[in-house]
Amino acid sequence: MDKATMQDRQQHIRNFSIVAHIDHGKSTLADRILELTDTISKREMQDQVLDSMDLERERGITIKLNAVELHYQAKDGETYIFHLIDTPGHVDFTYEVSRSLAACEGAVLVVDAAQGVEAQTLANVYLAIDDDLEIVPVINKIDLPSAEPEKVRKEIEDDIGIDAEDAVLASAKAGIGIEDLLEQIVHKIPAPQGDLDAPLKALVFDSVYDDYRGVVLSVRIHEGIVRPGDRIRLMNSGSEYEVTEVGVNSPKPLARDYLMAGDVGYITASIKDIQDTRVGDTVTNAKNPAEKPLAGYREMNPMVYAGIYPTDNAKFTDLREALEKLKLNDAALEFEAESSQALGFGFRCGFLGLLHMDVIQERLEREFNLELITTAPSVTYHVRMTDGTEKKVENPAEMPEASAIKEIREPYVKAQIMVPNDYVGAVMELAQRKRGEFDTMEYLDSNRVNVVYHIPLSEIIFDFFDKLKSNTRGYASLDYDLDGYRASDLVKIDILLNGDQVDALSFIAHRDFAPARGREIAAKLKTIIPRQNFEIPVQATIGSKVIARTNIKAYRKDVTAHLYGGDRTRRMKLLEKQKAGKKRMKAVGKVEIPQEAFMAVLKTDEDEKPN
């Protein structure tokens, strides 16, 4: 293909993402676009086509970004090449959204005609505005009885500050307004820039491991051209490879002769070493390299840490390999090896939030056939020691002795909660119960309020989101950012079973709530841990002080069942023998701890009261 044809092709490319709050209809809209552009036949059509993981379909959420090439015959008679990148909407996966947007020139903003602008809508659209993307607003679900498109149009203009006069009125489910949207994409979103003659510069925005092809890199070509047979260099690691295949997803992989500036596609180069590739890296030509790499992505720091252990210690290496492969496909995941007296060898993993942790655990179990135990998630604490040194503690079991600690600082978040007027009281009560400090309250219109609180991250990570939804009948929406560290009066609570400390059950709590939490957890463990043949004392301690104790009663086998009549000394002898046996068992007995016990540490009775 000559240069003029390539330049003409570049002018017909449109790269865009779809961004929205959870459940506003992104994936359904993507389905309709694929259908209308004949990218996928009616026979192959299924709901959430771009959500390729079973897990995404089951939960009805998008977890991974997904890029696909479509061809659209516009009303001006020209054929345009669309690269559509579907993105997640949940706060835990904001990182996936920011990576998708870096590969685009425009963003389609989907807002539910009944729900209006919500917290994640704002968070995601601001990411797009920061990247200078052209925004095409779509008001979706206009066929719902509760739809108020004009009110939502005004919200988009007032809350986000973008012109919504031409906003597309659509119903992705019914297929209304999809053609208008495609025409707006053609006319509003600019074609990509990029010099075809310059040295190759391609940004890696995702990668996945394929057993046959090695690492498959998802790239946005910013400058130059790449073809099979080219020698490429990954600028971050300096490793060089020969390209075996380039292509696009449509939505299945289609090999191409080349990828050029403006294209979004994939490159394979028989990369077997997972450590060589990193999301945010720049791919260039080894013989004619670019001088400077592209600006990558800011590294995401994990918010939540938890231990993941194989139930069978022999599977430790399998777990390491599985985590390495997942890290390719999920750049925000962090892990390092650790050991626990109770659970053996495993990994301390860092996640962006609880949903992220849940998804990783489920993917490890499904995709790699592993049986795992996950400990209760915790956050990173900054501990200042009496000798002046600082220590970061990600695992409560590693918290130093209280006598050696000067102060403990915990991470706080700035939580923005958008809520209807009627539920402001319920939200404020919940935030205060979670040790939140009130910051500001802003009335967005006559019915909606944006409440801002500073809340310890440890109080948010477990069930704050669920509580918020149930206390406001699902109307409130939440977005939060890390807001530095603050000193708090915190203590470590250890759990002892049968006199032995179970390091994986240790947790950190505020001193004021520690005795109550200790009692609740001891009582909870009593119901969760199965009864044994001997009595098990369950104790919660702070240092050497026991703050709660309960006993798990033993099973009792009737050893005298076969006796009838006769001398009672025979009966007493058998009962004494049983007692001695139980005593011996108690001395050497190991207590089996089920998975629910680790999560019980986080749930408190106060949380479980019906709202």
From Swiss-Prot:
SS bond partners: none
Pfam families xrefs: EFG_C (PF00679), GTP_EFTU (PF00009), GTP_EFTU_D2 (PF03144), LepA_C (PF06421)
Chain positions recorded as GTP binding sites: D23, H24, G25, K26, S27, T28, N140, K141, I142, D143
UniProt-recorded name of the protein: Elongation factor 4 1
Role according to the record: Required for accurate and efficient protein synthesis under certain stress conditions. May act as a fidelity factor of the translation reaction, by catalyzing a one-codon backward translocation of tRNAs on improperly translocated ribosomes. Back-translocation proceeds from a post-translocation (POST) complex to a pre-translocation (PRE) complex, thus giving elongation factor G a second chance to translocate the tRNAs correctly. Binds to ribosomes in a GTP-dependent manner.
Classification via Gene3D superfamilies: 3.30.70.240, Elongation factor 4, C-terminal domain (3.30.70.2570), Elongation Factor G (Translational Gtpase), domain 3 (3.30.70.870), P-loop containing nucleotide triphosphate hydrolases (3.40.50.300), Translation factors (2.40.30.10)
Membrane topology (UniProt): Peripheral membrane protein
Stated family: Belongs to the TRAFAC class translation factor GTPase superfamily. Classic translation factor GTPase family. LepA subfamily.
GO molecular function, one term: GTPase activity
Reactions mediated catalytically: GTP + H2O = GDP + phosphate + H(+)
All residue ranges annotated as the tr-type G domain in the record: 11-193
KW GTP-binding (keyword) present: yes
PROSITE patterns the record matches: G_TR_1, G_TR_2
EC number(s) from the headed UniProt entry: 3.6.5.n1
Keywords, sorted A to Z: Cell membrane, GTP-binding, Hydrolase, Membrane, Nucleotide-binding, Protein biosynthesis
Cellular compartment(s): Cell membrane
CDD domains hit by this protein: EF4_II, EF4_III, LepA, lepA_C
InterPro entries: EF-4 (IPR006297), EFG_III/V (IPR035647), EFG_V-like (IPR000640), EFTu-like_2 (IPR004161), G_TR_CS (IPR031157), LepA_C_sf (IPR038363), LepA_CTD (IPR013842), LepA_IV (IPR035654)
HAMAP family: LepA
GO BP annotation list: positive regulation of translation
This protein's GO CC annotations: plasma membrane
